[in-house]
Amino acid sequence: MHNRATGMAVVVLVATLLVGDAFAATFGVTPSGSSAVFYVDTNAWADIHYVRNNQGQLNYRMGIVNGRNQYTVTGLSAGETIDYSFTYWDVSCNCARDTAWTRYTHSGTQPPPPPPDAGTDAGTPPPPTDAGTPPPGPIVPLYTTSTPLEPATVQETATAIITRVGDRVRDRHAREDMFQSYDHYLPLYFQARTHYIEIVDEVAKGGNRVTVNLHTVYPYDRPDFRAFFRGLGTVAEYFHNAQFTTVNDYLYTSSVNFNAKEGRAIRVGDRMELEVGVFLRQPVEGRFNYYSTTYLYMVGSGGVVPYDVTGSIRDSIPMPQAGWSGGRTTLSSPQSNEPDNRFLQMANNLAPVSAQAFVEGRRIHHTNFGDGSHSEPGNPALTQHQGKLGPSYVAPSCVSCHVQNGRALPPGTNTTLTNYVVKVGQSNGAADPFLGYRLQPRRTSGTPEGAARITGWTVSSGTYGDGTGFELRRPDYAFTNNTPTNYSARISPQLVGMGLLEAIPESAIAALADPNDGNGDGISGRMHQVRDPQTGVTRLGRFGWKASTATVRHQVAEALNSDLGVTTSVFPSLDCGPSQQGCAGTSTELANTELDKLTRYISLLGVPARRNLSDATALRGETLFNNAGCARCHTASLTTSAYHPHAELRGQTIRPYTDLLLHDMGAGLADNLPDGQATGAEWRTPPLWGIGLTAGVSGGEAYLHDGRARNLSEAILWHGGEGQAARNNFANMNSADRNALLAFLRSL
């Protein structure tokens, strides 16, 4: 019989505030045997931040127990230390409060109660964090200790480690490459077809079972549970096959205490691959039978891990961490032969709160804001967004430019650029009088303000150090209706990993900046300081070819405004030049709730894993990449903040190969349009993760800000300015070394 006390963990999100609380809350810690109970005497939300024995910092949303927030740390021995602080909502000021860092030393006895707004002793503060070390200058960090956090996806209790992961339904099984139907999205994917899986691992705490709970948004009809991959008879065969027990219409449970793969009791370290067979209760609109994502859970560890495969049956094994490009958001090794769908996936560690919002955000991403239609067949129009397009616009939907969420390709010559952003303005940074800040080539009625097209390519030639020839090209542009004097044509970039880039602490980027080239290495990257359009404070620019926006939300809202003509609370006024007609006024066409869904979708796209981890050529190429000086700007590894609101993005070690800084890349890549503090020659270091999948996702290759580079070699050869030395080092390599370096890039 299912024991709900240990088999179910309930996440409670408290939306109401205390009434009449005029004082800050009392907080502290009470020892209890080998445990310590941390508490905040409030029943609004509260978070604990703690460092155990000077190890890494952990951040958790506390739970309400007997009217107050509590969190218990278990397995303590006398003398162990915990440095801790709390962030909690104080209704007396309608604000969040941070408590001072305090050190607790476990003794197993109960200390005197602490006074309000104080800890048990002054103690020693924990190591500095991103929130405690602000960047130089006026930049205000996005996230600090006072940022409200969504619930963690892994929770540790006295009896279990509990993992929760949000998911969507799938057409076929993960390894069925003959069908190529695992990574794509089926009709009505946004309707009644998400759930989350809860893994309650009692083995991790000395117990003898793992309970898997399935939480749904729509009633399921006797879903199946499979665990421990077998793969002998079919590519979807498992040793453990059971039917979930129905607890209620939205909760189903099953337990495992025997590792049928090994013929023994389940134990710590077991590789437990799991899959759910989904059957929607009928009658239901559309198809009723599906499969879940395939996950690998390592018993005793907590959290699902990206997996690779081994042997002829392609059994799942934990992916080496060198392959975790996006930390735990990293996608498992693809086995369904769908190269075009690699950038469409949910983060591997998606939180339950994100699952339904993700698919609804994807629906908005694929919606035509003119007629409300969905870009994929079988999906009804989203009628609430009909008629919001324009009047001037570039494309009718997000996906029109970001096809498969990948890099766009230049269109044929003399074709209007509708998958580019053509920024315009004056040499002093002011708006173009008749165009504003964007050239919008389409209009819902009347004559468009103007259009740009590539009329041809100017080709130049050169030779590598070994005498091998190469050709480079640059686009030639022409305009209709209005010809701007200052402009910058920028092709649509890939979208994966943006949430992780937002989560990098400003202090980490500040540590990489060297605006005056103080170390004399010829690299002088600088942070782009941009204005927050919502608060007016100065932020670190992170997104766009010149790092001109600070957050994913701002980037999405700007694209909606300037590319689709859809206003939001972030940008309520349309792009409009001072002498331009028909674009004045303010409005909010897309509500914040819808903008939030779209932002969450973009933020939580899974990052593909690095591949070919044991390939000798690619590994040699990595060394050549570093030795050539490429990594001086394309920083391999960074760690995200502990304070990002989304649990999926917090505390992740990622490998984006960017420093998010502006670098002068020389006259060859320069345009004549200033962008905030960025000059025409300065460009943000673009991330390299996923770059080796470009051809499969986009159906071709195009790199750099205007798509001029037809392959990775050309992209490198265009580097000038601060990138000139690295470019020359590449050009002077022999053919074998150049190919090795390219093999490394293609493995990313």
Give the ranges of each region predicted by the language model:
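Sec-dependent, cleavable N-terminal signal peptides
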Residues: 1-24
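Generic secretory/membrane-interface signal
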Residues: 10, 14-15, 69, 73-77, ...
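A generic structural signal for short, solvent-exposed coil/turn residues
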Residues: 16-17, 21, 30, 40, ...
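Generic marker of residues within folded, mature protein domains
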Residues: 11, 28-30, 38-40, 63, ...
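Periplasmic c-type cytochrome electron-transfer domains
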Residues: 134-748
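Intrinsically disordered, low-complexity peptide-like regions
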Residues: 1, 19, 81, 96, ...
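Intrinsic low-complexity, intrinsically disordered segments enriched in polar/basic residues
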Residues: 8-12, 81, 112-115, 120, ...
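Glycan-association/targeting regions that enable binding to alpha-glucans and other polysaccharides
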Residues: 21-158, 200-204, 209
